[in-house]
Amino acid sequence: MSQPTVNGSALIPLPYAPNWENGINLSYTFETAQFVSEQSTEQRRPLQSRERRIMEVDYLLDGTEAQQMMYDLAHGKDKVFGVPIYPETLIVSGFGYQLLSVVNALDYWNLNNYADYIFLFEPVSRLYETVELSGLGDTVIVAEYILQESFTANKTYVYPLFFGYLTTEPVLEPYTDQLYTVSLTFAEYLDGG
């Protein structure tokens, strides 16, 4: 699978919890080209190696978080984002040497088939880390390297990750006098673009 090279700060993380009330729309597109032969028969051919993931997500953030997110989005408008696939949330029940204990990891399509990276996020302490995936079992996720952060068991979420780019301008709207909603749409990079 062809993926962008991730080095240092090239990947912009999204360490924010989604607004589950509005739902998360994860869809798939597959681009093809139609060819017509001299006998007027039609044939479709794929223009990409597999389907492209598109994710529409809303975040409900306080003023400081909304300001930080808008700064990250302005900085990263033409860069690669690490987009967590929120519908495939797993809770980490324990940590070991490059191991994360989870339940039913093999039940998640994106984690099993397309994930090269995972995103760990502990909302209370705001810790997060992007980790390359080395192996996967039903009750364990193996990271390529030792985790840099000290996460807490049963308070840390792990998501499969895809590399994406913003397809529309971020929409920032007031929700209350202290909360804001930020609406984003990401498309996956495939085969270099």
Regions found by a protein language model. Name each.
Residues 1-138, 142-193:
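Extracellular/virion structural assembly segments
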